[in-house]
Design a protein with these regions (language model features):
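Nucleotide phosphate-binding site architecture
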Residues: 13, 35, 104
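Short loop/turn microsegments at loop-to-beta-strand junctions
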Residues: 1-2, 39, 93
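N-terminal strand-loop-strand
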Residues: 1-28, 83
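NUDIX/MutT-family hydrolases
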Residues: 78-82, 87-122
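Short aromatic/basic micro-patch
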Residues: 28, 73, 96-97
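Active-site segment of metal-dependent pyrophosphate-handling enzymes
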Residues: 2, 49-86
């Protein structure tokens, strides 16, 4: 999987998973599966376009995380990107822009907490206020 933490005006984007899907109702950073012909970066650019209608270029690679859920395992390539405009933003699911301090108000999949820890380890505190 490839996931991107998207920042806009010091806030980050969370999208709520559909209730009828696995981990339904939880909030997460946008992203998705990597197709067999794609690089991790190409996948995250495609997924962000599909999920948000935002066209991002040159997302910064942060690293990989692994997480074992009860019935499946994920390996996630994490990227981050600051955007200057959200005029083209179109999201079908519920979404919100929040500060990292506001994240505790939302139920996130466990893997998302590992992503936040990875961002902190990579000196991204300027985004994690």
């Amino acid at each position: 999987m490839s996931v991107c933490v998207i920042y806009y005006k010091s806030k980050l984007l969370l999208i709520q998973r559909p209730e009828d899907k696995m981990l339904g109702g939880l909030w997460e950073f946008p992203g998705g599966k990597i197709e067999s012909h794609e690089s991790d970066e190409a996948a995250v650019i495609r997924e962000i376009k599909e999920e948000t209608n935002l066209l991002i270029k040159n997302p910064r690679y942060v690293g990989k995380i692994k997480h074992q859920y009860s019935h499946f395992k994920v390996v996630i390539s994490l990227f981050q990107k600051s955007v200057n405009s959200i005029k083209s933003l179109k999201i079908k699911e519920n979404y919100i822009w929040t500060t990292t301090k506001g994240l505790d108000k939302f139920a996130l999949p466990k893997a998302n907490y590992k992503m936040l820890d990875l961002l902190k380890k990579n000196n991204d505190e300027k985004y994690l206020k």
